[in-house]
Amino acid sequence: GVEQIITVDPHTTYMMREIYPKYIENYDIKVKHYLEILSQKSENLAQFRAGETPEAFVIHDPCVMTRDLGIVEQVREVGGALGIKMVEPENTKMDTACCGGPVEYAFAHLTHQISGIRIGELAGLKSNILVSCPICLINLSRYEKSMGIKIWDMGEILSDLKSC
């Protein structure tokens, strides 16, 4: 049987790690977000550098990843090991502001209001924004053209690593 699942989405990690065990009898699968695993091996990442990426990013912490899972420093550890410079916005880490994505299907207008506030805060610091959640990526990417910014996912950066 399956012993461990590695996820790329904090929402999936939360559901499979925190909710499924409450409802599925004998559920004993270990569930980890990929950044939890990579941060434990960050010394191995030092031999790589991010490929064609900007010099610095403003970091957006996914709300579910930080508040519900406690995954906060891992993205910073992985980014730091790759030589990525990260700028912290005012609302960061456990106090991060949501991108609005989790409520999109029920309250689309509310999602746009929330994401508009968050993207204004982030874009005011840097034009390159780093996320580590596919929902944040999709939700914040809608502002790329109108605001002249670029939203990057950590997985995207990891897929283009170069040896030092």
Model regions and ranges:
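Iron-sulfur cluster-binding electron-transfer modules in prokaryotic oxidoreductases
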Residues: 1-164
